[in-house]
Amino acid sequence: MKLIKYPDRSQWNEILKRPVLETENLFDTVRNIINRVRAGGDRVVMECEAVFDKAELTSLAVTSAEIEEAEKEVPIELKAAIYLAKRNIETFHSAQRFEGKKVDTMEGVTCWQKAVAIEKVGLYIPGGTAPLFSTVLMLAIPAKIAGCKEIVLCTPPDKNGKVHPAILFAARLAGVSKIFKVGGVQAIAAMAYGTESIPKVYKIFGPGNQYVTAAKQLVSLRDVAIDMPAGPSEVEVLADESANPVFVAADLLSQAEHGVDSQAMLVTTSEKLQTEVVYEVERQLGYLTRRDIAEKSLANSKLILVKDMEEALELTNAYAPEHLIIETKDYMEVAGQIVNAGSVFLGAFSPESAGDYASGTNHTLPTNGYAKAYSGVSLDSFIRKITFQEILPSGMSAIGPAIEVMAANEHLDAHKNAVTVRLEEIRK
């Protein structure tokens, strides 16, 4: 961890830089795999699985028998926890349902919106160092609430061709339609273009490593929508002298254990807290099973001391963190001044872990500063809003002349004529 005290504004850009991974040949590699899958379908997907996941597969689909067997392997206490998380996620996302109302913009001119679910969506759930069954809930539950007809899930198998039981349990519970043993770039390509087994979808959701992220970016240029640009996960803790250093250190470490490219930041007005957090991080680090990962991640982490809360807020909004934890005595007032963040956790007893799993909010969030322009996944991510307008003769009489003038001044004669012929009919 790097301790920074009272940085000058000229240093902010350097201080707030995210970890950068080497990507010199990445896009060429990813593009090649995408093109191969697009041309060769299931055969190429299985070849990729053998190379990248060391799994020799004869079929890609997860069977009902496999799901039923997996459910038996999930411990009762984990099932209970998943049920609780599901209930809270459903409650929060159900409250986001759109209720469009008709608006009369003028007499005889009525406009409205209708929310329609995206019919086919694809969910990518990484394998890697941890089974992210929580991400299954975060993506499949709002998709189901939205009314998506087909929810396709791809996740990499282990070398024995098995998918983690908790992922399968969560997928069935959340209403996933089809599950496939496919990971990496090949999974994104398969969902973007379709194979003999895997349906083509209209929008792809889910996190992944730099290869998966690059694949999502490439297929989104023309062929399929994606949830958002994504990068390594990150957290900022914004704290004053009232914060508990044990809690702050725990929050920083909970982010650091995600991956070696994760970033954990503390921005504080208290030099005493900055010092105490360094001690607490070292103490708690010794208890972690993923200590090696956390230690490497902490190399990207910074503990920044600033002169006052005004500067802390300015620095925070410039950073635009994926996760922001506010541990100050007046956290509601401070929160009111946050304009750039993915998800905000207020007060000493609101750790990021709550949002990651079970509070009900979504943990699929914009990273890498994209919180300045993007929202996290919500019910809206799975729907489209179609606009409608009904114009009666009285409405056309009211707005028609203005349309004619505007079209004429844009030199679009056919646009003008489409109104003129109607006005002439009305005047008969």
Curated annotation (Swiss-Prot):
- Involved pathway(s): Amino-acid biosynthesis; L-histidine biosynthesis; L-histidine from 5-phospho-alpha-D-ribose 1-diphosphate: step 9/9
* Binding-site residues, Zn(2+): Q255, H258, D356, H415
Q: Which reaction does it catalyse?
A: L-histidinol + 2 NAD(+) + H2O = L-histidine + 2 NADH + 3 H(+)
Q: Does the keyword Signal apply?
A: no
The processes (GO biological process) annotated in the record are: L-histidine biosynthetic process
Query: GO CC terms on record?
Result: cytosol
Give the Gene3D superfamilies listed for this entry.
1.20.5.1300, Nitrogenase molybdenum iron protein domain
Single GO MF annotation: histidinol dehydrogenase activity
Residues holding NAD(+)? Y124, Q186, N209
Q: Which InterPro entries match?
A: Ald_DH/histidinol_DH, Histidinol_DH_CS, Histidinol_DH_monofunct, Hstdl_DH
Task: Note the SS bond partners.
Answer: none
Q: Which co-factors does it depend on?
A: Zn(2+)
> Pfam families in the record, alphabetically?
Histidinol_dh
What are the protein's UniProt keywords? Answer: Amino-acid biosynthesis, Histidine biosynthesis, Metal-binding, NAD, Oxidoreductase, Zinc
Specify the enzyme's EC class, one word: oxidoreductase
* Record text on cofactor binding: Binds 1 zinc ion per subunit.
Q: What is its EC number?
A: 1.1.1.23
Locate the residues binding substrate.
S233, Q255, H258, H323, D356, E410, H415
Q: Where is the active site?
A: E322 (proton acceptor), H323 (proton acceptor)
The free-text function statement in the UniProt record for this protein reads:
Catalyzes the sequential NAD-dependent oxidations of L-histidinol to L-histidinaldehyde and then to L-histidine.
Family per record:
Belongs to the histidinol dehydrogenase family.
Name of the protein = Histidinol dehydrogenase
Q: Which organism is it from?
A: Bacteroides fragilis (strain YCH46)
